[in-house]
Swiss-Prot record:
Belongs to the adenylate kinase family. It comes from Xanthomonas oryzae pv. oryzae (strain KACC10331 / KXO85). This is Adenylate kinase. It is found in: Cytoplasm. One of its GO terms (biological process) is AMP salvage. GO terms for cellular component: cytoplasm.
Length: 187
């Protein structure tokens, strides 16, 4: 199973990716985790990323794709993977499609977790309050959700046009959402 998990901040995609990893016994690949690991390891890509981040810039698609290509070349992805946090825009979706074609590992499915914006604001604000993060006020959360909507809506369309997208209701208990994802994937 080769799967991309999409969803706005607060939709539970990281939590569900971890649960799916255990269910399907395939690795959960988070581009954020990859980036931190490469920087910590001091790899050539990690050094490039560190330099970019030190300037306060976003890490380029090329650097992220290089890290992802290296990760997808590891033995533990032979049975599949769950990709979380990538792609975030259509250029990344095209690059991922080309990479997976090159390595003979096309995607099986893309799951979009749907959760209403107001519930996302409540979830993130509640989580931020519990963690003592005062910068996650409802207005800043709404702005982050708008950025997600603006950049990711075209990605959803990209996969929808290719017949890969499945939308899943992300509201409910962890078990209920996991069961919906499993059913949507035919598992």
């Amino acid at each position: 199973m080769r799967l991309v998990l999409l969803g706005p901040p607060g939709s539970g995609k990281g939590t569900q990716a971890t649960r799916l990893k255990d269910t399907f016994e395939i690795p959960h690949i988070s581009t954020g985790d990859l980036l931190r690991a490469e920087v910590a390891a001091g790899s050539p890509l990690g050094l490039k990323a560190k330099e970019v981040m030190a300037r306060g810039d976003l890490v380029s698609d090329d650097i992220l794709l290089g890290m992802l290509e290296a990760r997808l070349g590891q033995a533990d992805v032979a049975k599949g993977f769950i990709l979380d946090g990538y792609p975030r825009n259509v250029a990344q979706a095209n690059a991922l499609c080309a990479l997976l074609s090159k390595i003979g590992q096309p995607l099986d499915a893309v799951v979009q977790l749907d959760v209403a914006s107001e519930l996302l604001v409540e979830r993130i604000a509640g989580r931020a309050k519990a963690e003592g993060r005062e910068d996650d006020n409802p207005e800043s959360v709404r702005k982050r959700l708008q950025v997600y909507t603006d950049s990711t809506a075209p990605v959803i369309g990209f996969y929808e046009q290719r017949g890969k997208l499945t939308r899943v209701d992300g509201v409910g208990s962890l078990d209920e959402v996991l069961e919906r994802i499993r059913k949507a994937l035919g598992r």
